[in-house]
């Protein structure tokens, strides 16, 4: 979102809690994107305050990693609700605004939609569903709205610093950084990507294409 704000977009961030360091110029609105009434209030507020909605970026995501026998239905539903159902609710509520603006939707999935680790069933299912939802929406909202998906791999954060071996494992020679995803999001939001819709972009430094052999 900081990239979009820097590029001159009027940015509204929806979050359950106010971010510690929101991007300069962005407006933060409290919203539970897995809750239908909360999403309706968010979009109604954008309509009133901004009068239009050009781009919707759906990047809410959580993960609960447990063995399947220990994963409760409530935990499963929480992950699916936040990672998948939220995008359905947001697009449904914003459809009229997006069609009027000839806008764009960018969803943020994950390479876990294509490759898995143990005990990630809810997360993998939600992200795989989001990829499918993206191309379905691209057809349903055409020709007024473009819908595309970004599937990041390992994106380094302050709480998860990569080691030298982690960088070397990636064909690109490094682990991803938030700016890698932000740059593609900005491109898909703008007019330069006007002939792109229904696509999934894998941003993982080449890892999903790498053959891995037993040591």
Positions of predicted regions on the chain:
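Residue(s) in the substrate-gating loop at a strand-loop-helix junction
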Residues: 110
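Canonical Rossmann dinucleotide-binding motif of NAD(H)/NADP(H)-dependent dehydrogenases/reductases
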Residues: 1-12
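Alpha-helical segment proximal to the catalytic Tyr-Lys
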Residues: 96, 138-143, 194
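Short C-terminal tail/terminal secondary-structure segment
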Residues: 115, 197-215
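Active-site helix of classical SDR
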Residues: 91, 126, 134
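A conserved structural motif in NAD(P)-dependent oxidoreductases
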Residues: 170-181, 192
């Amino acid at each position: 979102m900081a990239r979009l704000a820097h590029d001159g977009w009027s940015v509204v961030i929806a979050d359950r809690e106010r971010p510690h360091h929101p991007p300069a110029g962005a407006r933060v609105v409290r919203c539970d994107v897995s809750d239908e009434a909360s999403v309706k209030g968010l979009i109604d507020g954008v309509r009133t305050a901004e009068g239009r909605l050009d781009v919707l970026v759906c990047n809410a995501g959580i993960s609960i990693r447990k063995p399947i026998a220990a994963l409760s239905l409530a935990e499963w539903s929480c992950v699916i609700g936040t990672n998948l159902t939220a995008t359905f609710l947001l697009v449904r509520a914003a459809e009229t605004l997006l069609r009027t603006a000839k806008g764009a939707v960018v969803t943020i999935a994950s390479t876990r939609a294509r490759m898995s680790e143990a005990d990630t069933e809810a997360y993998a299912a939600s992200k795989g569903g989001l990829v499918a939802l993206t191309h379905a929406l691209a057809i349903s909202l055409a020709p007024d709205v473009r819908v595309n998906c970004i599937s990041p791999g390992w994106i380094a954060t302050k709480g998860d610093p990569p080691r030298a071996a982690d960088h070397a494992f990636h064909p690109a020679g490094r682990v991803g950084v938030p700016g890698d995803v932000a740059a593609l999001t900005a491109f898909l939001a703008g007019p330069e990507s006007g002939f792109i819709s229904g696509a999934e972009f894998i941003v993982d430094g080449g890892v999903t294409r790498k053959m891995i052999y037993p040591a």
